[in-house]
Swiss-Prot record:
Catalyzes the transfer of endogenously produced octanoic acid from octanoyl-acyl-carrier-protein onto the lipoyl domains of lipoate-dependent enzymes. Lipoyl-ACP can also act as a substrate although octanoyl-ACP is likely to be the physiological substrate. Residues 1-222 are annotated as: LipB domain. This is Octanoyltransferase. Transmembrane segments: none annotated. Coiled coil: none annotated. The lineage of its organism: Bacteria, Pseudomonadati, Myxococcota, Myxococcia, Myxococcales. Residues 224-356 form the Nudix hydrolase domain. It comes from Myxococcus xanthus. Its EC number is 2.3.1.181. A motif (Nudix box) lies at residues 261-282.
Length: 357
């Protein structure tokens, strides 16, 4: 029997999500791993499918910046859609067997997997033939509203991208766009339909089981990811703020970053951050938990090595004395725009943004 390995990742920056899809699809293509289902949430983001029209983004650049929403072009089907907190995004990365190699059937099966979950909460939903996605209300009805977007990509019967189910989503953000280019109908969420917020973990559990049922597969839960911390060391406030960047030694990549490190056995993220701060800079200063946890793939390994990282900030006096540890060969205090330009990973940039907000 086929198996589907389910990864429940929490928050994933969008560009990290694209990297995960690429790595898992390559791993599947090369026979290094089996089918996987990635379940996650993205920060506010607008994505453009292959059929997207730019005019379906109705918000100005200033409005997008205010909401912290970036725009990405993708190779999935469909028009423009929104991703954000409270929305469960699923990326099935399946190599379809010969008896399932039909694009329309695959889309119907994704829809059915979502519809079965909605039914568990008493929500009746279904497809509308002329529009993609999962809908509440009939075609042509004045109250027809989309509850889940579907946008997939298939290459040699290997699937990527997937679905976005509005669970506890802020529906006001859909006013930034014409969702999927459809002006005649609205959007909704499970929270709006039921009048209460739902535990995301319960919906994830139901989705994982539903996909395994629809795709005749046995469920396997992914092993826990490696756990790491990032620490933005900052001195000064506002426009005068300066961020400590350290350069990894050439044999460790040679790039600039904020402080990072792995959790050791028995450590909490805060304990690991305090230890890394002292080991890598000689500083012993109180930490601020940024309430920022996200997942990503470490490097380009196949199958991917998953990491879950917690972000912290440290505010130090102007005369703070930095003494580099063995992992780095240089450090600089730079302004925030320079730090954001130099940092190679979105998660590190987000740590700096939060630390200097």
């Amino acid at each position: 029997m086929n198996t589907i390995t389910v990864y429940r990742l929490g928050r994933v920056e969008y560009e990290d999500g694209l990297a995960l899809m690429h790595l898992f699809s390559e791993s599947r293509r090369q026979g290094l791993s089996g089918d996987v289902l990635l379940l996650l949430e993205h920060p506010p983001i607008l994505t453009l499918g292959r059929a997207a029209k730019r005019e379906n983004i109705v918000a100005s650049d200033a409005q997008l910046a205010k909401e912290g929403a970036e725009v990405f072009e993708t190779n999935r089907g469909g028009d423009v859609t929104y991703h954000g907190p409270g929305q469960l995004v699923g990326y099935p990365i399946f190599l379809l067997p010969e008896d399932r190699r039909d694009v329309r059937r695959y889309v119907r099966d994704v829809e059915r997997s979502v519809m079965q979950v909605l039914a568990q909460w008493g929500i009746t939903a279904g497809p509308i033939p002329k529009w993609p996605g999962v809908w509440i209300g009939a075609e042509g009805a004045p109250d027809a509203r989309k509850i889940a977007a579907i946008g997939v990509h298939l290459s040699r019967w290997l699937t990527t991208h997937g679905f976005a189910l509005n669970v506890n989503t802020n529906l006001d953000h859909f006013q930034l766009i014409v969702p999927c280019g459809i002006r005649e109908a609205g959007v909704t969420s499970m929270q709006r339909e039921l009048g209460r917020a739902l535990p995301m973990a319960e919906v994830e559990e139901a989705i994982a089981n539903s996909f395994c049922t629809v795709f005749d597969s046995e469920r396997v839960d992914a092993p826990p990811p490696m756990r790491t911390v990032s620490i933005a060391v900052v001195k000064g406030r506002g426009p005068e703020a300066r961020v400590l960047l350290v350069r990894r030694r050439p044999e460790r990549g040679g790039f600039w970053q904020v402080l990072t490190g792995r959790l050791e056995a028995g450590e909490s993220p805060a304990q690991a951050a305090a230890r890394e701060l002292e080991e890598e800079t000689g500083l012993r200063v109180p930490l601020v938990d940024l309430d920022y946890r996200h997942a990503f793939a470490l490097g380009e390994a196949l199958p991917p090595q998953l990491v879950e990282e917690n972000g912290f900030a440290v505010h130090v006096p102007p005369d703070a004395d930095v003494r580099l540890g063995a992992e780095h060969d240089a450090f600089e205090w730079v302004d925030v725009p320079t730090a954001l330009e130099r940092l190679p990973f979105q998660g590190l940039r987000e740590t700096v943004k939060r630390a200097t907000a």
